[in-house]
């Protein structure tokens, strides 16, 4: 599936670059205002897949979201209140995240969308399933670019048999190292960014 939507490719690639670069900053999020008309908020995720996948608690609570993901979203959003209030409302807010950060970004977008902030878009890379069908219905009209790279195993968690779903269709990125069949290594955010650059170039 190619990338369809209203966001220019420069915005999408800048968001993915921020998702890659947020890790060395050792902070919960990274804000970029480099592209006119857009503010990008990249939420920190994790490149270490085994630790948190193993320890996931799969029970969906009454708010139809994974408890750990929702707690992380609330904590991150609380840190963003001051920064978000200072943003220009005429600029589109692009919320992005990789891995756990993708699930967190989805739930932050849900919180903002439900509170009437509709001038937003969502970009996720290698995100696990963030919640159930009620969440999917709530944000079905939200513009969302959901990238999956190669054989990344993280988007297959938590299990759909436990009630978890993805909220939007996938945009498949070819393996940046096409001789590799490693579902853990394919989760690397640097490879996501490189594959997205190639994806856009191939679809020009």
Predicted regions located by residue number:
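Non-catalytic, mobile gating and regulatory segments of ester bond hydrolases
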Residues: 1-96, 100-204
């Amino acid at each position: 599936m190619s990338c369809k939507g209203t966001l220019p490719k420069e915005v999408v690639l800048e968001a993915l670059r921020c998702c890659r670069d947020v890790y060395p900053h050792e902070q919960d999020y990274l804000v970029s205002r480099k592209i006119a008309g857009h503010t990008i908020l990249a939420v920190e995720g994790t490149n270490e897949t085994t630790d948190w996948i193993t320890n996931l608690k799969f029970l969906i609570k009454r708010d139809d979201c994974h408890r750990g993901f929702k707690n992380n979203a609330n904590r991150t959003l609380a840190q963003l209140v001051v920064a978000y209030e200072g943003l220009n409302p005429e600029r589109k807010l692009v919320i992005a995240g990789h891995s756990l950060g993708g699930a967190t970004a989805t739930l932050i977008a849900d919180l903002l969308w439900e509170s009437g902030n509709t001038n937003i878009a969502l970009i996720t890379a290698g995100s696990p399933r963030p919640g159930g069908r009620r969440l999917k219905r709530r944000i079905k009209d939200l513009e969302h670019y959901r990238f999956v790279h190669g054989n990344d195993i993280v988007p297959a968690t938590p299990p759909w048999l436990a009630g978890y779903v993805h909220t939007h269709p996938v945009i498949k990125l070819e393996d940046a190292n096409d001789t590799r069949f490693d579902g853990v290594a394919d989760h690397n955010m640097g490879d996501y960014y490189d594959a997205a650059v190639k994806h856009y170039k191939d679809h020009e």
